[in-house]
Design a protein with these regions (language model features):
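N-terminal leader/domain-start detector
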Residues: 1-24
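Core catalytic lobe of class I
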Residues: 16-412, 481
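Long, low-complexity, intrinsically disordered segments
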Residues: 458-481
Length: 481
């Protein structure tokens, strides 16, 4: 083990020949020093220029006695692009020509020997992400996608993110309620109605939509066993095929209304309704990008070819290119169109509770990774059918801003409570500024103590004056022989 040395008393001072002085020199007086050892791409110079604009030219160029650059060619080119005329320089006069050549290599290589502590870096970036910065963290030189990866590594990937609260029998939320969940919003509203999004979005545009609409399949006996779960309030097997297609068109049109050109729509669906989904996409002019398959790793109900997958259709709104945060693994994220995430099929108390709370609940990591693929930190993401609030939790963890609608007040409550449990913060009712707890107490009081109702004035009359005498109809029955 190497221990730190303390300076000896009477240790010699640094020789004057090794003391460094910063001088400012015109760019025009500086020249290249030997072979160019590092290759700078255009985006590298752009990143350096962005850093200089924000932090200033705080790292001087290193030059020899003839104004030849030893280190800092990239910074010099960035300064030229910014129109800077004079730059800070340190002249290395104590090294001979041979040592300068060796130093040029060492100075560029030694800094790369140490690796990053990814967990510590992730925590630092996570802390910075919580601050309302006036600039992007990609000024650090890391891409936005890499920053997302570091942050997720720093926080452990979302412990307890899939924990679901109990579904209430008497919901607090009511149709029309808009809840503010920190940076997110959840509205108890119909996802097919245009006016729902006037309240929810207030003119905002959406980068990505991830939604898991009802499949128009009866829950009882198909998705879960008999009696485990109530039916959805809409599209739970009661619609004809044409009606379900019309329903899908309306919902998909709302997504298309608010997506930015090039924004992606992730539309979860089962294999039975592939044609309905494609018909809705055609009717709303959405372009198909890919078809992803969620591999649940275990089969569900059924006796013939038990299903262990669900489909996630990926559509794009025309008029722009979609945001690609994968780029064939360039940023450390390797993705294909087969997504293997453990589902709630199989055994175990935790999975049984998840099935009981919501029959088609998606793993938070599945939704989060889709948001990481197609959006940036701070972007607005939309879920038309919020259900248990998984998209809201995924947005919370990935530093996106979720906007969600859910028609069933019970599931609105689940989404609110789940977010509160996960973050430790309180949801606020937009209309009154009250917390969820305060609204719950107030509405319980209203139910427990309804306003008095005046008794109606009754007039007693003789039934013989009003009602005719009953007519008795006698049917003759044949006598037994």
């Amino acid at each position: 083990m190497v221990s730190a040395r303390t300076p000896r008393q009477g240790a010699p001072a640094l020789p004057d020949s090794l003391k460094l002085t910063i001088e400012y020199l015109p760019i025009a007086t500086l020249g290249a020093g030997g072979r160019k050892l590092r290759l700078h791409k255009k985006q590298d110079i752009a990143a350096l220029a962005k850093a200089i604009e924000l932090f200033g030219f705080v790292v001087p160029l290193l030059i020899d006695q003839d104004n030849k650059i030893i280190s800092g060619n990239g910074r010099l080119e960035a300064a030229r692009q910014l129109g800077i005329t004079d730059v800070p320089c340190i002249r290395l006069t104590h090294l001979d020509a041979t040592k300068l050549r060796v130093f040029r290599i060492a100075e560029n290589q030694l800094g790369q020997l140490a690796g990053w502590d990814n967990e510590a870096l992730g925590l630092e970036l996570q802390d910075l992400s919580k601050i309302d910065l006036s600039f992007s963290l990609d000024v650090t030189g890391f891409s936005a996608a890499r920053i997302d990866s570091f942050i997720l590594e720093g926080d452990g990937g979302g412990e307890n993110a899939d924990v679901l609260p109990d579904r209430p029998t008497s919901p607090v939320s009511r149709l029309g309620d808009l809840w503010h969940l920190g940076d997110h919003r959840l509205c108890c509203a119909d996802a097919t109605a245009p006016e729902s999004f006037d309240v929810l979005l207030k003119g905002e545009q959406v980068r990505t939509v991830f939604t898991d609409p009802p499949y128009n399949v009866a829950v009882d006996g198909h998705i879960t066993g008999s009696g485990q779960h109530g039916e959805f309030v809409m599209a739970s097997g009661e619609m004809t095929d044409d009606e379900f297609t019309a329903f899908s068109i309306k919902a998909m049109a709302r997504a298309a209304d608010h997506l930015v050109p090039g924004g992606l729509l992730y539309w979860c669906m089962d294999w039975r309704h592939t044609l309905n989904t494609l018909s809705a996409a055609s009717a709303t002019a959405m372009e198909m990008v890919n078809l992803c398959v969620w591999d649940k790793t275990a089969g569900g109900m059924g006796s013939f070819y038990r299903s262990r997958h669900e489909l996630v259709f990926v559509f794009r709104k025309p008029g722009g290119t979609h945001l690609n945060r994968v780029e064939l693994g360039k940023h450390g994220r390797n993705r294909s169109n087969v997504w293997a995430y453990e589902g709630v099929n199989g055994f175990g108390a935790k999975k049984a509770k998840a099935r009981e709370m919501h029959p088609t609940v998606k793993p938070m990591a599945l939704v989060r990774d889709a948001l990481l693929d197609s959006s940036a930190r701070g972007d607005i993401v939309l879920d038309l059918f919020s259900g248990s609030g998984t998209t809201i939790i995924a947005a919370e963890q990935s530093y996106r801003q979720a906007r969600a609608t859910e028609l069933d007040p019970r599931y609105v409550d689940v989404g609110v409570i789940r977010w509160q449990d996960y973050t430790g913060r309180e949801a606020i009712l937009a209309a009154t500024g009250q917390t969820f707890r305060e609204v719950r107490e107030q509405r319980r009081m209203e139910v427990a103590s309804p306003p008095p109702v005046s008794a109606p004035q009754l007039t007693v009359v003789s039934t013989t004056d009003v009602l005719p005498a009953p007519r008795v109809r006698v049917r003759a029955r044949p006598l037994a022989a």
